[in-house]
A protein has these predicted regions:
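Intrinsically disordered, low-complexity linker/terminal regions across diverse proteins
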Residues: 1-252
Length: 252
């Protein structure tokens, strides 16, 4: 950052110089191998990411706190929260964008034609499923725009749930807490991450610009495709969260 000059004369001028430095830094990297030691987020950022060009997942220190991770919470809640986030980022390596990169981070078509065709078939069904959602009034979600994140949400749920079940091998089933079984608490841990109460105007704005589905649908739409969720809450045909088995889509 030695070329970046910060002065006490003007806030706007500092922002302008910082933006110009950032632009120049990105341009200077063009045509060069990716720096696999570079982080794209600060330690203070409450978020996580997968970088396909370096084939790595990153979890800044700030995300290791409630509601994502709680030292005092039971394993089910933590697996359903930070566990799903970890699985989510892992799955990005195999979503509609990440699958185009090989293990070295090169843009390369490394899938067999058969695998690619089956993936596309399932992905198209999942995209349509989300596009059928009405977010407000007569406005629909954009399942194609949010496809990568929806695949990652589903993959994260599947991977984290499997990891949680593996952690219970040879142990007694945990006793219910607050009236909820351990299986139910796994999904409650996930749902708790995306609780959201926003105005219709914000719903419309996010639907246009955010590649993630709205919080409500990151939970409800994702879980309706997962058989284990039905078992955990004993969901029956005719109930709001029920979806016919033939209509459920699982990518991975």
């Amino acid at each position: 950052y030695s070329a970046l000059e910060i002065k006490d004369d003007s806030y706007w001028a500092n922002i302008e110089r910082a933006s110009q430095w950032d632009f120049n830094d990105m341009i200077a990297k063009a045509g060069k191998p990716g720096d696999k030691d570079e982080w794209l987020m600060t330690p203070q950022t409450v978020n996580a990411y997968y970088n396909p060009t370096t084939n790595e997942i990153c979890f800044p220190a700030a995300i290791l706190q409630a509601p994502f991770f709680d030292m005092n919470a039971d394993d089910a809640m933590n697996y359903g929260a930070i566990g799903v986030v970890i699985g989510h980022e892992m799955t990005h390596g195999f979503d509609d964008q990440g699958r185009n990169y090989d293990k070295e981070g090169n843009l390369s078509d490394w899938w067999t034609a058969e695998d690619a065709a089956l993936f596309t078939q399932r992905a198209d069904r999942l995209a349509q499923q989300y596009s059928d959602i009405i977010v407000v009034d007569s406005v629909h979600a954009n399942g194609r725009f949010t496809l990568g994140e929806n695949i990652a949400d589903q993959g994260g749920l599947m991977v984290a749930h499997l990891a949680y079940l593996n952690s219970l091998e040879g142990k007694e089933t945990p006793a219910p807490i607050d009236g909820f079984t351990n299986e139910q608490r796994f999904y409650l841990g996930y749902a708790n991450l995306w609780a959201q109460n926003i105005r219709p105007e914000e719903i419309l704005r996010l639907t246009k610009i955010d590649p993630h589905s709205l919080g409500k649908w990151r939970v409800n739409a994702a879980l309706r495709n997962i058989d284990a969720f039905y078992s955990a809450f004993d969901i029956k045909e005719g109930e709001p969260m029920y979806m016919l088995p033939a209509d459920r889509v699982v990518i991975w």
